[in-house]
UniProtKB/Swiss-Prot annotation:
Its main location: membrane. The gene is vsb1. Disruption phenotype: Decreases cellular and vacuolar levels of basic amino acids (arginine, histidine and lysine). Small vacuoles. Residues 612-733 form the STAS domain. It is found in: Vacuole membrane. PANTHER family: AFR304WP, SULFATE TRANSPORTER YBAR-RELATED. Keywords: Amino-acid transport, Membrane, Transmembrane, Transmembrane helix, Transport, Vacuole. Pfam families: cNMP_binding (PF00027), STAS (PF01740), Sulfate_transp (PF00916). This is Vacuolar basic amino acid transporter vsb1. C-terminal GFP or HA(3) tagging interferes with activity. The chain crosses the membrane at residues 153-173, 199-219, 258-278, 291-311, 327-347, 358-378, 426-446, 499-519, 521-541, 543-563, 564-584, 627-647, 659-679.
Amino acid sequence: MPTHSLNQKRSLLYPSIDNGSVPDSSFLSQSFRDTNDIHLLSARLASVEVDPETLPSNSPETNDDVSNYDYMSISSYQRAHSLASTSRNDFNYRPSEINETRPLLPEREEHSSQLPPAQNQVLPFQSLNAPSKKLRGRISLSKIYQFFFDDKGPILFILNIPAVIIGLLLNILDALSYGLILFPISDPLFKNLGADGLAIYYVSCVVSQLVYSLGGSFFKGSVGSEMIEVIPFFHQIAFTILNRVGEDNPKSVIATTILAYCLSSILTGLVFFILGILRLGRLIEFFPRHILLGCIGGVGSFLVLTAVEVSSRLEGSVSFNWASLSALFQPMTFAKWSIPLFLSSALEFAQQRWPHPFLIPSFFVIAPAIFYVLVWAIPGMSLEYLRETGWVFSSTETNVPWYHFYSLFSLRDTDWSALLATVPEMCALTFFGILHVPINVPALAISLGLDFVDTDKELIAHGVSNTLSGAVGSIQNYMTYTNSLMFIRSGGNNRLAGIMLALATVALLVIGPGIIAYIPVWTVGCLIYLLGIELLKESLWDPIGITTKIEYFTICAIVFTMTVVDFVVGIVIGIIMACVFFVIQASSRSALRGIYSGGIVRSTVRRPMNQQRFLNEIGRQIQVCKLSGFLFFGTINGVEKNIAGLIEELNVSNNPLRFLIIDFSLVNGADFSVVQAFLRIRRMLATMNVQLCVCGLDETRSSFKTLTTMCFGGDDNCGCQVFEDVNSSLEYCENMLLDDYDVYRTKLLHKAGYSHTLAVPGKHKQNISMAETFSPSPRHDLLRQVAMSSVKAETKELSKFEKYAKYEQPFPLLMQVFGEITTKREDFWLGLCPFFKKAFLRKGDLLWRKGDTPSKLVILETGMVKASYQMDRESLSENITCLCVVGELPFFSKTCYNATVVAELDSAVWILDREGWETMLKSSDKAEVIENEMLYLTLKMTRDKFNVFTNFALNLYR
C-alpha cells in the first residue's frame, strides 16, 4: 500500500529521525514542518549520483574516510576537518545568522543624543501657529482677525460684496426651486405651506453656512444649501403620514410631518458625525456608482413631474391616468406647464453650447424683468388677474411671518405611530444623503487645485450642521459643489465672505416670504424643470457608452421604479439588482487563473542533469491549478468542472495525472459552498488515485480554517498534502517521481551490469519493495517508459564514469558535473583538478551574502545548500543539491553575488577561489581556452537555471 503521508515516507527513508520530536501546533504547521523533509529527500535523491566506494578521497590534505559518512542521513556527517582548521586555500565560514533564533530587529545601540533641544525643533505635521503651553486655552484676537480677514484688513468687506450678491442670488433661486416645494403644495392640505418651506430652507442655509465658515470645513468659501435629492423623500414622508392620520386631522398631519423632517435631519447628522469620528469616509465610496446614478435619475423624473404640478396649478398630484392627462392638455393648463418646459430645454441647450457659470443666474434675473415689462405694456393686463389665473403666486400664501413654521410644531398633536411608520423613508433619505459628500468634496478640491482634503473632517462638519439644523427645526443641508465653486471664483474664498452670506440670508429670512407674491409661477417651474432635466441627463444620457449594458439596465429600472412605484422601493430594487448582477458577472469570470504542467513549471531546486532530463519528460504528470479572487458558489462549480475535464483530457492523451497541486495564494477568501465542492474534488481524486496537494492557505483567515479542517485535515484526508507555497509542493511531487525513478533506474542498471557504478549499495532495499507493489497502470507504464529512456541516455556515459572512478577527486566529480555539456577531453579537466580545494560545511554555515565580492565558486559533492534571493517586495529560495555548481556566474563575470547562500545540510564541497583561478590561468599556456570553456559552461548552466526561474515566475507569480 503506498504511503500518502510525507511523515510516513520520511520514517522509511530516515529511520533515525524522530517524527514526534516536534510538538504539534496546528494542521498547517505540521504540514509546513514537512518542508524540511522535502529538502532532505531532494538531497538524498541527488546523492544517488555519488558512489563513495568507487570515488576515493582527493588529496593527502584531507584524509577522509568514506565510512565516516552516513548516507542514510545526510545531516549526520562525521568530518575529519572543520573549516576552522583548513589551510590557507580554504575559507573561513561564519555560522549563518539566518535561522530561527535570530531576532527580527537588531539590538538597539546606545548613542549619546546630539539633537538640539526639543523646543527648538519644528516637528512634522505640527502647526506653525500652534499656541505654547502657557497660552493654551486663550483666545488670540490676532488669530481670529487672521482667521477671517486673511491679512487683507477691513477692505475685505468691500471685496466680498460681489461674491455675497452672487451667493445670495443662488440661495434665492434654490429657495424657489427647493424650499417652495419642501411640502407637497399640490395637495390641498399642504397648499399654504410654501412660505413656511422657504423659511425652513433659509434656516438650514444659515446654520450650514455658519458651521462651514466658522472653521468646520476645510474650504474657506464653501456654501451650504439644501439637497435637492431629498425632496422626493420628504414628499414620501408627508404622504405616508397623511395616509396614516387621514385628511380629517390636518393639524396632526402637519405637526407629525414637520417633526419627521427635523428628526431625519438629526439622524443624518448623527450618521455623518459617526462616520467622520470613526474615519470611515472612504467606506461610502464602495457604494456602486450606477445605483447612485439610478437614484439621481429617479429624483430627476420626480422633479419634472413636480414642475408640471407646480406650473399647471392643478389640485392634487399628476397621475398616470386619463383624467389627469386630459386636464394637463387643456389649452390654458397646457400653456402654463409647456412654456417653462420649453424655456428650461432652451436654457439647457444654451448651457451646453455656452457653458458660462453666470448664464443661468442672469437668465432668472432678466426673464422676470422682461415678464413684468410685458405685463405693464399689454393693455388690460394686471397682476391681480395673473394671480387669479395662476401665472403668479397668490399673496394669501405668503402673508405669514418667517417664524410661522415654529407654530406648526405640536407634540400633543403628533401621531407617534405615523411618525414611526416614516422610519424607512428617514433611513433611505439618510442613506442617500451621505453619498454626496465623498463625491462633492473631492470634486471641489480638484476644481480648486487642492491636493489634499480630509473627507472625514468634512463629514464631521456635515454632522454638526445637520444635527444643529434639525435641533432648530430645519432640514438637511450639505456643501453644494456648484454654488461653492461660483462663490469662490467670484472672490468669496475667505471665511468672512461666508459669514457675510449667512447674515445676508438672515436678512432675507427676516424680510419674510412676501416677495413670493411677485414671482411668476413659470420662473419656479422653469427652475425645477431645469434641475430635473439635468439630473435625468446625468443618469440616462451621460452613462451611454461608459457603463455596461447590465449597469445601464439597472439605472433604467431604478428610475422607472422610483417614478411609477416608490422611492424607497426603487433604492431596494437597485441594490438587489446590483447584488444579483454582481454574482452573475463574478461567476462569469473563472476563479481558475490557469493550469500549468509540471513539465514546464518546475520547482526552483537545482538538480543533476539526468534528473532534470527525467523531470522534463515525466513532469506532465504534475498539474498546477492556480486559483484567484474570492471563491463562492458562483465560481467554484467552474473550478470543479475544469478539474474533472483536465483529468479526462489527460487520460485520453495517455498522459494520466498523478499529482494535482491547487494553489490558494491569490485567493482572498471562500464561503461554505467551497468546502462542499472541495470535498467532492478530494473524493474524485482519491477514486482516480491522484495525489492532491494544496498550498498558499492562510491559516489566520476563518474561511481558510474551515476549508483546511474539513477538506485537507484530519485522518480522513485521502492522502492530501498541505504546503506553505507552490514551490514546496512542486518539490515534493518531483521528489516522489524521482524516488520511483530511482527504483527503476537501480533495477535497469543492475540488469545492464552497472550495479556498482554510481548507485549506493544497500540504500534502496526498502524502496525496491515499495516499488514492486505498484500495480500496473497507465501512469506507471509512462513512468517506466520515461525511466528507460533516461537510463538509456545515461548508460552511454556510464562506461566513462567507471573509468573515471579510479581517479582521485575532484576529477570524477568534475566529469559528472560537466561531462555531458563540455566540449573538452579528459586531460583538460585533469589539469584543473589541483586548483580545487575540498571543504566541509556544517548545517547553517554561510558561504556568502548577497552583494559580497565574488571570491569563489563551489561544486557540491554531497549535501545541499540554499540560495536566498531577496528583492524589494518578494523573496525566493533555491535549494541546490549535489553535483551542482554554485556561484559560477558572479565568479566569472566578476559581479557581486545576487543571493545569500547557506548550507541547508551538512555538505562536502569543492571550492575554486579567485587566487586559484588566477594561478590556473597564469600557469597554463592555454589560459584563453580554459577561460572560454568555463564561460561557455557557465552560460549553458545559467540558461537552464534561467528557464526554470522564468517559467516559474511568469506562470506562477503573475
